[in-house]
Amino acid sequence: MSHRHHAALVASASGRSPSWGSAISQSFRQVEAEDPFRRAQSMRGHDEEEEDLRWAALEKLPTYDRMRRGVVRSALLRDGDDDHKDDDDAGTGKAVELVDIGRLATGDAARALVERLLQDDSERFLRRLRDRIDMVGIELPKIEIRYEELSVQADAFVASRALPTLSNSAINFLQGLIGQFGSSNKKTINILKQVNGILKSSRMTLLLGPPSSGKSTLMRALTGKLDKNLKVFGNITYCGHKFSEFYPERTSAYVSQYDLHNAEMTVRETLDFSRWCLGIGSRYDMLTEISRRERNAGIKPDPEIDAFMKATAMQGQETNIITDLILKVLGLDICADTIVGDEMIRGISGGQMKRVTTGEMLTGPARALLMDEISTGLDSSSTFHIVKFIRHLVHIMNETVMISLLQPPPETYNLFDDIVLLSEGYIVYHGPRENILEFFEASGFRCPQRKAVADFLQEVTSKKDQQQYWFLDKEPYCYVSVPEFAERFKSFYIGQQMMKEQHIPFEKSKIHPAALTTMKNALSNWESLKAVLCREKLLMKRNSFLYIFKVTQLIILAFLSMTVFLRTKMPHGQFSDGTKFLGALTFNLITVMFNGLSELNLTVKKLPVFYKHRDFLFFPPWTFGVANILIKVPVSLVEATVWVVITYYVMGFAPAAGRFFRQFLAFFVTHLMAMALFRFLGAILQTMVIAISFGMLVLLIVFVFGGFVIRKNDIRPWWIWCYWASPMMYSQNAISINEFLASRWAIPNNDTTIDAKTVGEAILKSKGLFTGEWGFWLSIGALVGFIILFNTLYILALTYLSPIRSANALVIDEHNETELYTETRNEEHRSRTSTTTSSIPTSANGEGNRPTQSQFVLPFQPLSLCFNHLNYYVDMPSEMKQQGLMESRLQLLSDISGAFRPGLLTALVGVSGAGKTTLMDVLAGRKTSGTIEGSITLSGYSKKQETFARISGYCEQADIHSPNVTVYESILYSAWLRLPSDVDSNTRKMFVEEVMALVELDVLCNAMVGLPGVSGLSTEQRKRLTIAVELVANPSIIFMDEPTSGLDARAAAIVMRTVRNTVNTGRTVVCTIHQPSIDIFESFDELLLLKRGGRVIYAGELGDHSHKLVEYFETILGVPSITEGYNPATWMLEVSSTLEEARMNVDFAEIYANSLLYRKNQELIEELSIPPPGYRDLLFATKYSQSFYIQCVANLWKQYKSYWKNPSYNSLRYLTTFLYGLFFGTVFWQKGTKLDSQQDLYNLLGATYAAIFFIGATNCMSVQPVVSIERAVYYRESAAGMYSPLSYAFAQASVEFIYNIIQGILYTVIIYAMIGYDWKASKFFYFLFFIVSSFNYFTFFGMMLVACTPSALLANILITFALPLWNLFAGFLIFRKAIPIWWRWYYWANPVSWTIYGVIASQFGGNGGSISVPGGSHVAMSQILEDNVGVRHDFLGYVILAHFGFMAAFVLIFGYSIKFLNFQKR
């Protein structure tokens, strides 16, 4: 309606006399009343005319411009609000515009278009796309993947040699070197065994198989992403072409089961970057051809589809509408602008991160998708909708897809066309889904009615599970092995048909030109560099705190150094003044260099994501290297500027402006060189422990030969090449020449022993430095050369080096027929055991031969847990306050009541965000923040957390365990500290063995635990270990958080059978569960169902076949009845969803609160809140089960076991110690036997300083990752009340002390003999004591920083602040007596200064000889040490006491920090 007509109507309605216009309006309204559709039809006609005009204008444009213009509704260019209106409204009165597609590709317009395209469903949208393509006769590319006789093998150590002990690691290393020239002792493991198959286009294949069957290996092999250390046999072809003829990495997309992303990027930014790098494929060419044919045929396409296709065909955009489409389809639009996060940065949930991993590959143009375990952490509804979209993509767009799923529910399973069943490396079945049950029935096995087919398929090949599915009553059951199944499939008609198809070669003439990708990267080199540079800028912005912290740290150090080397205390002009100026220059140089040390950490941190992107051909590796180099140039500029501007004039350096800018130039190129060096070291060393150990060794070499510690003339001939190869030497020359060739040092030289005209030249010559101005520019040129060299080597390392992978290991137990195979994080974890799973008893009574309480060695007291009107609040998050929420608190649990009883297994279920884990944490007392309201009682008495921790167990979802111990050692350790002190050792071990048998870990008792996803146990085995560790405490109540999350159906069955066995012993067990299968769900006795917001909507028994739950919901008006055979858990969550509540206009929480069931539950709570007759409240005489002494012994036992099996830390410790010792011994070879001059003494002083400081700093930094991993374990064990924090600190310090003693002896023997110190027993043992003590306090200091900070990264940054201060006040760069009086206290507070004092005093303080000094005279050595260095021999007793004091102080701070500082926020 026009504005005039509308105004007339308003005027009429307001009572004014009707005008001529209002009369016409009234007449028009009467006509409308007679024909209500006329107006809408008229307006639609107007829109169509306008659209035709716009389209005609578009058709007149050149092809290039036409591909970048589209006809769209104006509303889409505003805010998209109208998309939420009815279709009739959306189609009337809306103008259309001819717009630049670039406006439509991003922002609200893109989201509005995606909303409109997907308003019905994804299938309709894809069909609209396909209809346009078919209308002009365009054929879509198709890909067929064939694999014939495919075998994959790996080499691994076997038996006891597979355990990573220090002795084994040394033997394996030596034999590995020998094996390069001879035979290897590794055993060949067959991962895939001559498998055959065809993946066809327009068919979606489900890959099923138990853990270690080879699923990931098969997918990686088919996509060309197998580790190069694996041996591959057989043929893999795409449309008849071998891998050498195209790039499989880009033709197909592999979605890994591991989630590797930049934690600081948002979900949208992550997908945008992958889409940008993966490119558009053939979309632009196809769209151009479609547009040409439409134009020739006079066809006008659907404007919205045309606009969408043009937007997706735009190459090189930073963001694109494809990202919005994938976000919407995967349900990530609600968290699109949330950072991904990691274990230290709070971000999206695990399920959302899994979808990000999937979406990352879906944004690309690949037409073959192989997706590995994409459902981990997702509920069945999300999995179903994602797989359904992929099914539409396959069937409508002719894509080729294989998906591996864990526990696929029946509705998801039925979406697939084909099934591949893989077991023990054999293909048991590969063919249509409809025929797989027929194949197994032909072999005598039938799937029960209420059994999910996918669960049946994963259990029927298991020796332990197979018999229950045998249905031929007239024939005796006989185990059918996996190889037998594989042979039977070959003779089955489906297998015969597939073999025939494989024998017919693929007709290469039929292949679509765009099917296979022959270009290595989607983008040009410039576009790739631009994309990576934009991402690195973004990451740098997100890490701005780190760079601000570094600059702040530099400013603080600058002010500290200014006050030490204050110009008023820095006289110049005399030869003796040069030492202090050289010390100041050297400290400045070290600070600027070491401030770039964080680049090592940042480089190592980026590598996992880089390797993924490199291997997936996102970009050429050199672009990543160049981007990181360029982005850090401003950092070097800022840090060099800050340091020089603050320090130069205050320290009293040469005042000329030219000298100022030359020093700035020297520090700037030095910082660039240091950053390049650290980047290069990070790229080749790859892990933090190795990077720190060998990186510090490289820095030591660079520093020692830097021109200050030892003069060039005093360097041994075999090391002189290192002097010329040390970048720091050129930096030292540049800054020294710049200072000492200034006019104020041009005073005539009076020292006849040095051939130099001026004092400045004499100082330079005395240190072996260049003496001409040419030396400055030569040094700058050399540093630029090093910058180019290190950056080039960095790029080459990125391009050609593969990630460091953990050693392959295989443990074989001939008696138990168990194999455990561990490989790398990027390669599939494989572990095979002949005793796997059996079905969970569906009876709530748990029929079968289960252990009962009477069968256990140790009795326990059954307890019930009641909670009434429970509420939980947290402070309102700042993000939510910014969105306008004014409340101060956010309620996560709302009026929850319930009871958990002995012998009953209770399921705690709800959608994501319902508060399942929150409720469990509140009940278990694990919350560290928030406010709890309501009552919690334990068998009638109020719950006290101190005693409750002793009688309860909590199985966390994360499965946190010490990685370097065996399964048996983990469980025994838990039993040792958690069982009562009156339980003797033999009884304790018997109980441990009973528990291991209960959870079916007895066959894995000697297996290493390892790190999740990296080494050791599989996910399912770790779950059982978590249960065993808690069960061995003999608890009455056990909480389990998501015990089946991330497991396949068979592994979940093992875990749930373990849980069921635990309940049958009479314990109270509560599990949170995430979308369980029918088998798992009906193994529970009771259910507590929560809705979003932490409100109860059902609490009560499940009943046989869940009939009580079903009856309750079916009595609610509007709830649809459950379909026969449908999973009650899935049905329950579907009918109680928020959408269903809105549809029925009900609140299920209110319905429950007003129900008879609620009143019965309240009566039960009241009944259980009264203590039973004769029952007393729990009371323990001591806080912990064991005495402090036993706690220390047990903790030390575990740490000893852990350290012995941690060669990556301890073997590396001793190897680097040997190399450090060898280096110092050869550099300062027999220097201790020749002490004729003051310079000789100073050279030895420099050797002592460097020998102590650098290896100590290495210890300090390398211990931090180890302690950080163990701290996470400590938080779990401490929450369980296992031991005192001080006993843990004692054990951690003690085991380090032991290893440090060995390290100190090794180091002392090497350098003491090679440097040539005096072989007197007293001097040797003094030296040994100070070296061992320094190793200890450095190590304890590193441990202390970890305990005081929330992350190892922050602790590492603090080290880069502390170590320069220790270095400055160590007594070498500036002697004690030269330190200003206001800073001399820090000399005594610095442990390194005490060690250097002790070594110098013990070795040389008591010597009676004299040495020559500048000027030619001779002075007693003890006199020089006292007057110049400030060292006295008679002070040694105090020095020894100081070392004990520093060690004790750091250990105590570590212990009390562990006790009082809890950085785990729950």
Swiss-Prot record:
One GO MF annotation is: ABC-type transporter activity
Q: Which UniProt keywords apply?
A: ATP-binding, Membrane, Nucleotide-binding, Repeat, Transmembrane, Transmembrane helix, Transport
Region feature (Disordered): 1-21, 821-851
Q: Which positions bind ATP 2? A: 910-917
Q: What is this protein called?
A: ABC transporter G family member 40
Family, according to the entry, reads as follows: Belongs to the ABC transporter superfamily. ABCG family. PDR (TC 3.A.1.205) subfamily.
> Its topology with respect to the membrane?
Multi-pass membrane protein
GO CC list: plasma membrane
ABC transporter domain location is 176-449, 865-1117
Q: Where is the ABC transmembrane type-2 domain?
A: 527-740, 1190-1404
Q: Is NAD set as a keyword in this record?
A: no
Q: Which residues bind ATP 1?
A: 209-216
Instruction: Look up the domain of life of the source.
Output: Eukaryota
Give the main localization category.
Answer: membrane
Q: Where is the composition biased (Basic and acidic residues)?
A: 821-831
Transmembrane region positions?
545-565, 581-601, 633-653, 664-684, 690-710, 776-796, 1209-1229, 1241-1261, 1297-1317, 1327-1347, 1355-1375, 1396-1416, 1435-1455
Query: Which CDD domains does UniProt cross-reference here?
Result: ABCG_PDR_domain1, ABCG_PDR_domain2
User: Which portions of the chain have biased composition (kind: Low complexity)?
Assistant: 833-843
Gene3D superfamilies, per this entry? P-loop containing nucleotide triphosphate hydrolases
Compartment annotation:
Membrane
Can the keyword Cell division be found in this entry's annotation? no
